[in-house]
Design a protein with these regions (language model features):
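Mitochondrial intermembrane space
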Residues: 23-128
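Membrane-proximal basic amphipathic "stem/tether" segments
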Residues: 1-23
Length: 128
């Protein structure tokens, strides 16, 4: 699965895959894996892109807004971003990004994220 995700991310970054093509791969079960709890082990190198099936949660560790610390729960961040509701499932795109010097917390979609200083890894989520 990881090799397929890396190939798709490679072509996606270069604009060689349309959203419809990615969605078709997802629907056929070729692309998305179940989401890990967080991105601690996957947030390197910067630019690494994954597609995960996630079931939203409203409680759990969440630091940042739009860009989250590597140890933030993917399920909670997805609800905070408004990509999925708690208890519902969706496929999300997760990209490892350079960590900012500071993570700003906020309240969104029934989830409160928290401020945090420097952290070694970070990611952002997007709808597919």
């Amino acid at each position: 699965m990881k090799v397929i995700q890396e190939l798709v991310a490679h072509f996606d970054r270069r604009g060689r895959l349309s959203r419809a093509q990615i969605r078709r791969l997802l629907e056929q079960g070729f692309l998305a894996a179940d989401a890990p709890a967080n991105m601690v082990d996957l947030a390197q190198p910067v630019g690494a892109t994954y597609y995960f099936r996630v079931t939203g949660e409203s409680n759990g560790p969440c630091w940042g807004t739009d860009v989250y610390t590597g140890d933030t729960s993917i399920a909670v961040a997805a609800v905070h971003m408004g990509l999925v509701k708690a208890g519902m499932s969706a496929i999300v795109r997760v990209e490892a990004v350079s960590p900012p010097t500071e993570f700003q917390g906020s309240a969104r979609h029934g989830v409160t994220s928290h401020d945090f200083g420097r952290y070694g890894s970070a990611y952002r989520l997007a709808a597919v």
